[in-house]
Structure formats: structure tokens, C-alpha cells
Amino acid sequence: MKILVTKNKEVASQNAFELLQTDIINGAQVLGLATGSSPLGLYQKMTSSSADYSNLISINLDEYVGLKPTDPQSYHYFMEHHLFAQKPFAKSFIPDGSNLNATEVINHYNKILATYPIDTQILGIGNNGHIGFNEPGTPFDSQTHKVKLTPATINANARFFTSSKDVPTEAYTMGIGSILQAKHIILLAFGEQKADTINKMVNGKITTAVPASALQQHPNVTVILDEQAASKLA
């Protein structure tokens, strides 16, 4: 696990962009993408660059169950607004949150992941150590599944909604086993509130209680932090 500690989010996002572009130059064709605040700076670098992604494929980690793609709080909408409208990809896949047939959604997404193995996966990390929507206790060999979100995750995401009561309680997510199949993983984390979790991920016991600790088992992970998120690392 390679750790890059940067001065701030701006520098971190630039470093992530440069790493991603290097992977693409070296042949990466399928990008695993994340939502939330952590990758926003990276997406801003991508959209403001001259880079062309129209021959690449993107596969997103997750989506809320029950939200249509046109819902402003859906991850479909997030990705369209922050990246795809400015930088289209050849194909972009996101779980269909409007489809309440979980078996159908899960089987379809697992087929996509089998057809298009991910070269570079972008990740954020939750305060409880979740990656994607893989909450504590998720098996490390898990594939795509429907998850019931913990109160901690719902409260953390409430800032994007009118209130915590409006946050969906379930999501479709790629599993930890799916994430670990990526050839290169780039994880971004910022702020003092992530410091304890980052330390557990990097230096702690490998345990399902901290889903991101599974990344210790992966041979090619780059963790990009600001000084605050890195403040608890030895």
C-alpha cells in the first residue's frame, strides 16, 4: 500500500489525476468510479483537462435503491453533472436504483463486471471504514449485493438531502470482492474526521469490522491523503 500525503485536497486531486492519466496511457480501459465529496476534485481535474475518455468504459460502485436516474440525489445524476456531461465515456454503467428487483440488478451488474474487468478503481472511504456501500461486517469475498445502510452512513449522507429522513435506507453496491479485482486502486480521503479510520485501514487488523482494511490484501493500492487525514498515521 503506497501512501501519498499532500498539503491539501487540491494537490491530492492533482496527484490522483496524474496517476489516473498514467494508468490510461499504460493501457487502462475500464475505470471504476466513486461518488461523494472525495473524488470531486479529481473529476474537476478530468473535466478541465484536454483528456479524451470517449474510448473508455466506466463502472460505478453503487446507487441508492428507489431513486430514478433523473433524481438529483441519485448517483446517476451526480456522475452526469460532475463528469459525464463534460467528458462522455464509450459506455458508463451504474446500478439501476429504480429497479426494485434486486436479483435482476445484482445478476446484471455481476455480468458487467465479468465482461469489463476494472483496471483502475477510484475509492473514497466512510467514517466507519466502508468502501462503496460495503458496511462493517461485509464479507471480503462479497460480490454485487443490496445493503441496508447503517445509521452512521445515513447521517453522514444527510448533508446531501433535505434531512436524514429523506436519505434512502438501502443501496446496490459492488462487493469488496469485486473491488479487490481491480488492477490498481486509488483511494482518496480528506479531513481530520477520516484520520482514525485511515489509521485503522493502513495499520490496523484486517477485519470485516473495518471494510477498507481488506485493501491491505491488494498488491497495488495508492492512498492519497491531505495532512489532516494522515494525522494519525505513525
Curated annotation (Swiss-Prot):
Instruction: Quote the CDD domains the UniProt record gives.
Output: GlcN6P_deaminase
- UniProt feature coiled coil, ranges: none
Q: What is a single cellular component term in the Gene Ontology annotation?
A: cytoplasm
A GO term for molecular function: identical protein binding
- Provide this UniProt record's keywords sorted from A to Z: Carbohydrate metabolism, Hydrolase
Q: Which reaction does it catalyse?
A: alpha-D-glucosamine 6-phosphate + H2O = beta-D-fructose 6-phosphate + NH4(+)
Pfam families attached to this UniProt entry: Glucosamine_iso
Q: Which Gene3D superfamilies match?
A: 3.40.50.1360
Q: Where along the chain is the active site annotated?
A: D62 (proton acceptor), N128 (for ring-opening step), H130 (proton acceptor), E135 (for ring-opening step)
Which GO biological process entries does UniProt record here? carbohydrate metabolic process; glucosamine catabolic process; N-acetylglucosamine catabolic process; N-acetylneuraminate catabolic process
Pathway the protein contributes to: Amino-sugar metabolism; N-acetylneuraminate degradation; D-fructose 6-phosphate from N-acetylneuraminate: step 5/5
Could you tell me the EC number(s) of this protein?
3.5.99.6
On the tree of life, the source organism's domain of life is Bacteria
**Presence of keyword Zinc:** no
Q: What class of enzyme is it?
A: hydrolase
- InterPro entries this protein is in? Glc/Gal-6P_isomerase (IPR006148), Glucosamine6P_isomerase (IPR004547), NagB/RpiA_transferase-like (IPR037171)
Family of the protein in this entry: Belongs to the glucosamine/galactosamine-6-phosphate isomerase family. NagB subfamily.
Function as written in the Swiss-Prot or TrEMBL entry: Catalyzes the reversible isomerization-deamination of glucosamine 6-phosphate (GlcN6P) to form fructose 6-phosphate (Fru6P) and ammonium ion.
The identity of this protein, by name, is: Glucosamine-6-phosphate deaminase
Source organism (scientific name): Limosilactobacillus reuteri (strain DSM 20016)
Task: Give the lineage.
Answer: Bacteria, Bacillati, Bacillota, Bacilli, Lactobacillales
